[in-house]
A protein has these predicted regions:
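Primarily recognizes the serine-hydrolase "nucleophile elbow" in alpha/beta-hydrolase
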Residues: 259-326, 330-336, 548-620
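Hydrophobic h-region of N-terminal signal peptides that target proteins for export
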Residues: 65-73
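Alpha/beta-hydrolase-fold serine-hydrolase catalytic core, especially in secreted/extracellular enzymes
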Residues: 75-168, 175-178, 194, 237-253, ...
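Alpha/beta-hydrolase-fold catalytic nucleophile elbow
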Residues: 213, 299-302, 474, 514, ...
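Residue-level detector of structural "landmarks"
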Residues: 1-10, 34
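Cap/lid segment of the alpha/beta-hydrolase catalytic domain
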Residues: 184-263, 304-314, 463-552, 597-606
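Short alpha-helix boundary/capping segments
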Residues: 7-26, 45-51, 64
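Bacterial N-terminal signal peptides that target proteins for export
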Residues: 33, 49-62
C-alpha cells in the first residue's frame, strides 16, 4: 500500500470494526483503482505538500475507498440512496402502471380531434367492398324461401356480398307494396336475428328491415382442424386473428352494413336509410353512420365506449387507440342532427323459425377466417413494398431512410407515453456477496406512479478501466434472480442456466431488469390499448431511464452495451433495441419467428389463437413490421438469433425462413458478418454458447 493510502488506512482504524473491515477489504479488492487515485507518492513527496493539501488528499482517498466498499456489496451503490422497499417489486410496478393509466386518460381526452377517417382506420373498415351488391335468397332447396308472412310484409333469409369471399347473412323484412324507407337493425350479439321481436315494429311502420347476423359473444368458434381449442366466443376468436392484420370484428360488421346501404341506394337512391342497434350492435351502428353520411338517422342510445375501466370489458371491444381519438360525446357530435328514433308502429310479434342457424354461423365465421387468412398470406408482400422504398445502399443511408418508418412503428404499433419528466431518484440495496460477483437491487423512478426495477451484477474483482455491460431480460413470469445463484435442480436453472453469472465471469457488468409481464398483468394491456399504448410503451421508457443511469456509473463503458433476451425477453429484444441505439449488439433467444403466422394461424398448435396471451396482439403489425423488419431496424448493429430445435414456440422451418430475410438484408448492405443464427439441440431455454462468443466479439474485440 502506498504512503497516501496508508494514511487513509490510519483513519480507517478509528472507525468501527465492521466499517474498518469494509474499507480495508475494498482497498485490497481494487488495488489498481486505489493506487491510481492515491498516486504513488513517496514520503518526501508528501512532505512537500501543505497540511491542507494532505488532508484533502486523504479525504479523496477515503471517498474513493468508500465507493469501492459499496462496489464490494457492503452498502448502496455510489450516487444512490439506500433502498428500503419491502414487498414484491413486480406487483408494485404493475399496480403503479395501472394508476398511471387512469391518470393520463383525461390528458388524452382533452387533446382529441375526432376524424371519421381515423375511426375507419381504428376499426379496420378499409377494404374495398364487392360491387355491385346482389341480394340472394339463402336456404336449402327443400325449404320455402319465405320464413313467415304478415299482412303487409314477408320475412326472407338472404345473403349479400361484402368483401372478397365474405357474404353477409340475415333476415330481410320486405314490404309487399314497396317500402317507405330502410331500417338496418343490429341486435345484441348474444341473439340470433330470428330472436328479435322488436323488428316487427319497424316493419309495421312501413319500412323494409334488414337484420344482419353478427359475430356471437356467446357461441364458440368452429373447431380448429387439429382439434385445438380455447374457451372463447366467435367475437374474441375473430378479434385475435384480425387485430394483427389491422382489422376488427366491429369493422367487419360495419362493412356488412355499408354493403347493405350500397345495395339499397342502387335500388332506391332517393329513399332514406336508418340504422338502430343494441349492445355491441349499437357500436357497429354508430360507427357505420359516422363513416357513411348516406345513413340519415341513427338510433343507438348510450354506447358506453368510455367505461369506468377498460380492464373489465370483453376483449372483443378492444379497439386500439379508440379512447385517444374518440369519446362518447365525440361520436355523438359527429352524428349531429342524425341522432333520433326510427319510426315504429304497434305490431304483433311472430315466431320466425330458426333454420340451419348452426350451419349459417359456421359458414359466416369460416368466410371471415379465410378472408383474414388471405390478408395474412399477402401481408409479407405488403411489408416488402413498404420497406423496399426506404432501403439504403449503405448503413448510414439506411439509418436516415428508415427514420420515418421507425417513428411510425413507435407511435402507431407500440405506442409512446406522453412526455413527462420525473427525477429517477436512484436507490440501491446490496445483495448477499457471492464468490464471483457482487450485486445490488436497483430502483429508478420513471413516472410518479411507477418505477424501473432491476439487479446489477459486477465481477467480485472489478478490473481496471471501464467494462462492457450486458442487459439480460427474463421471460414471461420471470424474475431477475432467475438468472443467477440458482441450484442445478431448479426450474429457473433449467431455463436460464445462471447465464448472468457466465457473463460476469467474463469480467462484464450485467443488468437484469424486472419487466412488467409477471403475475396478474394482462389487464394493463386492456387499459393501455384504447389509449394507443402497449406494454412496450412502459418497458421502453423503463429501459431509457435505466440506461441513462447505468451509463453514469464510473466502471460502465457506455460504448459497449449489449442485450440478450429469452422468450418474452426475446420479444423485448425486437421492441427496445431497434429504437435504442445505445445497444451495440443484440441477441434474440427463444422467440424469433414467422410472427404473423404465430399470431393468426388457425392450423398450428403453437399459435396464439389457442392461448390466453392476448398481450401478444399488436395492431396492424402484419402490414408494417414483423420480426424480420424489426430486426432490420437494429442494423447496422450486430444481431443474433438463438434457437433450440425443440423449442415449442414454433418450428425451425418458420424461424429459418424469417431469418433468411434478415440475413439477405445484412448481406445486401455489405455487413453479413454482423448477423447469424445459433441453432442448438435443445428446448426453450438459454444455450448461450454461441451468444457468448457473439457478445465477446462485438463488445470486447477491437
Amino acid at each position: 500500500m502506498t504512503p497516501g493510502c496508508a494514511r487513509a488506512a490510519a483513519i480507517v482504524a478509528m472507525q468501527s470494526q465492521k466499517t474498518r473491515e469494509i474499507l480495508m477489504s475494498a482497498a485490497v479488492s481494487f488495488p489498481s483503482y486505489a493506487a491510481r487515485l492515491c498516486g504513488s507518492r513517496t514520503a518526501s513527496d508528501s512532505a512537500r505538500q501543505s497540511g491542507q493539501n494532505s488532508a484533502m488528499r486523504v479525504r479523496v482517498v477515503l471517498a474513493t475507498i468508500l465507493a469501492f466498499a459499496s462496489l464490494a456489496g457492503a452498502q448502496p451503490l455510489p450516487g444512490t440512496k439506500p433502498l428500503d422497499f419491502r414487498g414484491d417489486p413486480a406487483a408494485a410496478m404493475v399496480e403503479g402502471i395501472g394508476r398511471y393509466l387512469e391518470r393520463i386518460r383525461p390528458w388524452y381526452a382533452a387533446r382529441r380531434n375526432p376524424d371519421p377517417n381515423e375511426l375507419r382506420r381504428l376499426i379496420g373498415a378499409i377494404d374495398r367492398r364487392v360491387e355491385p351488391v346482389v341480394m340472394e335468397l339463402a336456404g336449402a332447396v327443400d325449404q320455402p324461401p319465405v320464413l313467415v308472412s304478415a299482412d303487409s310484409f314477408e320475412v326472407l333469409a338472404v345473403r349479400w356480398p361484402v368483401l372478397e369471399g365474405v357474404s353477409g347473412e340475415g333476415l330481410y323484412l320486405r314490404q309487399f307494396s314497396g317500402p317507405r324507407h330502410l331500417v338496418i337493425y343490429l341486435p345484441e350479439t348474444d341473439r340470433e336475428p330470428e330472436q328479435c321481436p322488436e323488428i316487427f315494429e319497424f316493419a309495421a311502420a312501413g319500412a323494409d328491415v334488414f337484420v344482419p347476423l353478427l359475430l356471437s359473444s356467446v357461441h364458440p368458434p368452429p373447431p380448429a382442424p387439429g382439434g385445438w381449442a380455447k374457451q372463447q366466443s366467435e367475437r374474441e376468436w375473430v378479434l385475435r386473428m384480425a387485430f394483427p392484420l389491422g382489422r376488427h370484428p366491429i369493422g367487419l360488421e360495419v362493412q356488412q352494413v355499408l354493403a347493405l346501404v350500397d345495395w339499397w341506394k342502387q335500388k332506391y337512391p332517393d329513399r332514406l336509410v336508418e340504422i338502430a342497434g343494441a349492445g355491441d350492435g349499437a357500436w357497429a351502428a354508430a360507427f357505420a353512420a359516422v363513416l357513411d353520411p348516406r345513413i340519415a338517422l341513427v338510433e343507438t342510445g348510450m354506447l358506453g365506449i368510455e367505461p369506468p375501466s377498460w380492464r373489465d370489458q370483453p376483449l372483443y371491444r378492444n379497439i386500439f387507440g379508440l379512447s385517444r381519438f374518440f369519446g362518447e360525446q365525440d361520436i355523438r357530435a359527429l352524428l349531429r342532427f342524425r341522432l333520433g328514433t326510427a319510426p315504429r308502429a304497434m305490431a304483433t310479434p311472430m315466431r320466425i323459425p330458426l333454420r340451419n342457424a348452426e350451419a349459417r354461423r359456421l359458414r359466416f365465421v369460416r368466410q371471415i377466417e379465410e378472408f383474414l387468412g388471405r390478408l395474412a398470406r399477402r401481408s409479407r408482400r405488403v411489408r416488402d413494398e413498404l420497406w423496399a422504398n426506404i432501403r439504403g445502399s449503405s448503413p448510414e443511408e439506411w439509418r436516415r431512410a428508415a427514420a420515418p418508418l421507425e417513428r411510425r412503428i413507435r407511435e402507431e404499433m407500440l405506442g409512446e407515453l406522453p412526455p413527462e419528466t420525473a427525477a429517477p431518484e436512484p436507490r440501491s440495496r446490496p445483495l448477499p456477496p457471492a464468490p464471483h460477483f457482487r450485486g445490488w437491487e436497483v430502483m429508478l423512478q420513471v413516472r410518479p406512479e411507477f418505477f424501473a426495477w432491476g439487479v446489477l451484477l459486477v465481477p467480485a474483482s472489478l478490473p481496471e478501466g471501464r467494462i462492457p455491460l450486458v442487459v439480460v431480460q427474463h421471460g414471461l413470469q420471470g424474475r431477475p434472480q432467475d438468472l443467477f445463484g440458482q441450484k442445478p435442480d431448479s426450474r429457473a436453472f433449467a431455463v436460464y442456466r445462471n447465464f448472468a453469472e457466465t457473463l460476469v465471469r467474463e469480467g462484464w457488468a450485467v443488468y437484469l431488469p424486472q419487466n412488467l409481464y409477471t403475475g396478474d398483468f394482462r389487464h394493463l394491456v386492456r387499459m393501455a390499448h384504447p389509449l394507443g399504448l402497449t406494454q412496450y410503451s412502459f418497458i421502453r421508457e423503463q429501459y431509457r431511464v435505466a440506461l441513462d443511469w447505468l451509463q453514469t456509473l464510473p466502471f460502465i463503458d457506455a460504448q459497449r452495451i449489449g442485450f440478450y433476451g429469452l422468450s418474452y425477453g426475446g420479444k423485448t429484444a425486437l421492441r427496445v433495441p431497434p429504437f435504442e441505439p445505445r445497444f451495440r449488439a443484440v441477441v434474440c433467444a427463444g422467440d424469433f419467428n414467422e410472427w404473423v403466422g404465430k399470431l393468426v394461424s388457425t392450423e398450428e398448435p403453437w399459435s396464439y389463437m389457442f392461448t390466453e396471451e392476448y398481450d401478444m396482439l399488436e395492431w396492424n403489425l402484419a402490414h408494417v413490421a414483423s420480426h424480420a423488419e424489426l430486426a432490420m431496424l437494429i442494423a447496422p448493429r450486430p444481431f443474433l438469433v438463438e434457437r433450440g430445435h425443440r423449442d415449442g414456440v414454433g418450428i425451425d422451418e418458420w424461424v429459418l425462413g424469417e431469418f433468411a430475410r434478415v440475413r439477405r438484408f445484412y448481406d445486401e448492405m455489405g455487413i453479413g458478418n454482423r448477423t447469424g443464427i445459433a441453432l442448438f439441440n435443445g428446448p426453450h431455454r438459454v444455450d448461450g454458447e454461441e451468444a457468448l462468443r457473439f457478445l465477446k466479439k462485438w463488445l470486447t474485440e477491437p
